[in-house]
Amino acid sequence: MGKTSRDKRDIYYRLAKENKWRARSAFKLMQIDDEFQILKGVRRAVDLCAAPGSWSQVLSKRLYEEDQEAKIVAIDLQPMAPIPGVIQLQGDITSVDTANQVIKHFSGEKSDIVICDGAPDVTGIHSLDEFMQAELILAAFNITSHVLKEGGNFLAKIFRSRNSSLLYAQMKKYFKKVYLAKPRSSRQSSCEAFVLCLDYSPPEGFVPTMGKTSLDATDASAISPDIIDGFVTCGDLSGWDSEKSYPLDIDACFPKGEIDEEQKKRYEFKDVVQPPTDPAYKAALDKKKSGVFAKMSADLNRQLKAELSRGKDQKKTPAENVPSVEELEKAAEKFQL
């Protein structure tokens, strides 16, 4: 596969690199904001699960254009390359200490908006992925209840499923309006969407806590069909299609043929704006590049062949020829895995 193939298959990936966004997800936030104006008048914003930082970039660009005194706090477990004007916290969003640090950076005040584009590493088992995403939204809501001011807004990624209406009903207990937003840059074939909760109004007597394992119980059978205030598609319908492949020649693929001289420049491949600084998979990649896994595989194959050969001589069953767990652990220890 050529290095330009993804530029052809994913126009938003290509545009993100050309416009110096760290990820294509920047367009999702911009399209939601264009539709709902959720960043208008915001002076304090929190970006949860922020790495690699594309949503923080959008916050920085749009908030500082309107108010130079705005403050932005980005939180992630992983380290993230610096972004001008963004305060970065490497911490756990399930920790009260992290919430206290946010409020400290805001000089004792609470945030106008909390956004979260986080998602678990998907397994391909849809029910499990949906459950893990729901757990992440719960964690995001828990810290949001500590740092969001009344009247503030909350935006989070969700994976749509048959149980999604329960989540909307639960959120409606804390926010006056709940929308389901689907940006144009989010692939239509994906179950990804964004729950947008407007005007934070917690119930009387509500005490924020990080210990919640679920939102307040709601009888799913009693959910009203109008629990969501609207399903909204965001973005220009005549614009780029996230499902379509485009030619590298910008003249041939620009919608409606409306391009200026700057956009007519010859296509040039660009690397990603900001690769991960210290990804969790880096150690595994280093071991793979150094040949550790190949050596381990070869060693185990030799051991298995020897056992099979010995088994034939001693007439062992196939199950008896397989290396034991202890033998595999010794092999792994040998290669420092």
Swiss-Prot record:
Pfam families tied to this protein: FtsJ
Active site positions, chain numbering: K157
Keywords (A to Z) from UniProt: Cytoplasm, Methyltransferase, S-adenosyl-L-methionine, Transferase, tRNA processing
Example GO BP: cytoplasmic translation
One Gene Ontology CC term in the entry: cytoplasm
Annotated binding of S-adenosyl-L-methionine, by residue: G53, W55, D76, D92, D117
Domain of life from the UniProt record: Eukaryota
Gene3D superfamilies assigned to the protein according to its UniProt record, in alphabetical order: Vaccinia Virus protein VP39
Family (UniProt): Belongs to the class I-like SAM-binding methyltransferase superfamily. RNA methyltransferase RlmE family. TRM7 subfamily.
The protein, known as: Putative tRNA (cytidine(32)/guanosine(34)-2'-O)-methyltransferase
Source species of the chain: Caenorhabditis elegans
Taxonomic classification: Eukaryota, Metazoa, Ecdysozoa, Nematoda, Chromadorea
